[in-house]
Amino acid sequence: MTTLLYILGFIAYFLAYVLVGRIIYNQLYVVIKKDFRIVYWIIITIIGIIFPLCSMISYFTRVGGIIEILGNIGFSILAFLLYLVLFGLILKIILLIMMKFIKKDIVQRKINQFIIFLVSCFLSLSIVGYGFLSLHVPSVTKIDAGKGDNSLKIVCLSDIHYASFGSTLNLTKMVKRINNLEPDIVLFIGDVIDSDIDKINKNDFITNVNNIKSTYGVFAITGNHELKYNTLEEIKDFYLKTNVRLLLDEEVVIDEKIKIIGRIDYSYPSRKELNEIISATNLPFLVMDHQPQSYRESLKEGASFQISGHTHKGQLFPFQIPVSIFYRLMYKTWYIDGIYKKGDFTSYITRGYGAWGFQMRTNGRSEIVSVNFKY
């Protein structure tokens, strides 16, 4: 089934790619000599097939080297082309508006298709460059949650997507950033591993996460990616080799101060209801839930805080719009990013630390969340 979806996705991609190629061709028509128009389409076709094909081969087989490099270049080119078309359309709309107020011949003489193309290229390169920088220079978002005279510093990371195709994630830098915050507790909010555990560099992952320093330890939950490619037993066995405690619809008490509840991802068929996990111990508690749509359940059961990820805030602009529409239609909420408060309850959806597929973030920097949890 997964293979079929990838094949259908590839066909849909290629059809969309041809459409993009046609739009760019129309913009360049006045400057492309007739003899080179066939060459243009040959180049466009080769790029459109080779790069995504390399992406698929590398993703399924984890082949590295030139295959992975070509695939990663393909994602970057695709992002560039998407923005090229987007900016081209915006500039054409601006041009049409100008033509309503300025003599048409003046506008056409001074602003032609080729100039629109050049400006679109500049803007596209700029936003793709910003996206690379945003991924590799994470922000630290500080929030307050809970109530009381005492507090714990809880550092949260979601959607690391370790070993995602083409990933340039540096775990050593990530751990250093975590330790610099001097956390009491560290939480990994799912999609820590991108796909098949057997295909990742286990030694690199284990060595680095075991260097995390926190007063009360490191806790993790599953995301949809871990569960899609691995069984629960495989995930548990892997985490047992680390200093990270995996919570699978479980509750843990931290020094008789607070409780942490870690939920299995929403996609898991046998996931428990939250009220089945909560014990009678009268302590303030927070909920780790990879997908955010069950935040109302946490509110209902009296949680002080819920931390989630999954949405990436769309990762690439303007994909936060269809993501918001999807959540509105499926879960009756527009809430896909940032903080939500109601009474004493606080929920936060992080943009995530890593990236999937496109190794860039044009919708905001990658993120580490530092929670001042009061109890």
Predicted regions and their residues:
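Non-catalytic terminal accessory segments
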Residues: 1-135
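Hydrophobic alpha-helical transmembrane segments in integral membrane proteins
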Residues: 124-148, 164-169
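Soluble catalytic domains of enzymes that build or remodel membrane lipids, polysaccharides, and related
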Residues: 144-375
